[in-house]
Amino acid sequence: MLSSIADGKSTIRNLNDGADLQSTINALKACGAKIDSRNQTITIEGVDLTNPNEKLDCGNSGTTTRLISGLLSSQKLDFTLVGDSSLSSRPMKRIIIPLQEMGCEISSNDNLLPLTIDAKEGIQSIDLSLIHI
C-alpha cells in the first residue's frame, strides 16, 4: 500500500496471491495506482492517488478495509468502502472514531460497511486511547 504513494518504483517478490491481496490491488488501482502483478511478483509505481470513480470493494478483507481507509484519508480523498456480507457485518467503529477525530467526515450503516469517507480537507494528528474503542 505504501509503495503506491512512494516516490519511484517498488518490486515485491514471493507474494501469496490470495483474495485479500487482490482486493487491495483492485482498490488501489481504482485510485490510480500503477500496479503490475504476475508470477508472485508485484511492481508498484508511486503516484498521486485520485478519487475513485467507483466504490472500493474490499471483499472479505478486514485488513484492506482498515489500512486503506487511513492511507486514502491521508491523501485527501473522498471514497466509499464496501465488502462482502461477512465483512459488512463486522463493526468498523475502531476506524470510524479515530478518522472522525482526525477530521474525516464519515457516513456508515450503523458503524458497518459501507463506509463513505470524505477526507478532502485533510487530516490532523490526534491523541488516541485504544481502550475506549
Residue ranges and their predicted role:
Residues 1-131:
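Structural preference for solvent-exposed beta-strand-turn elements
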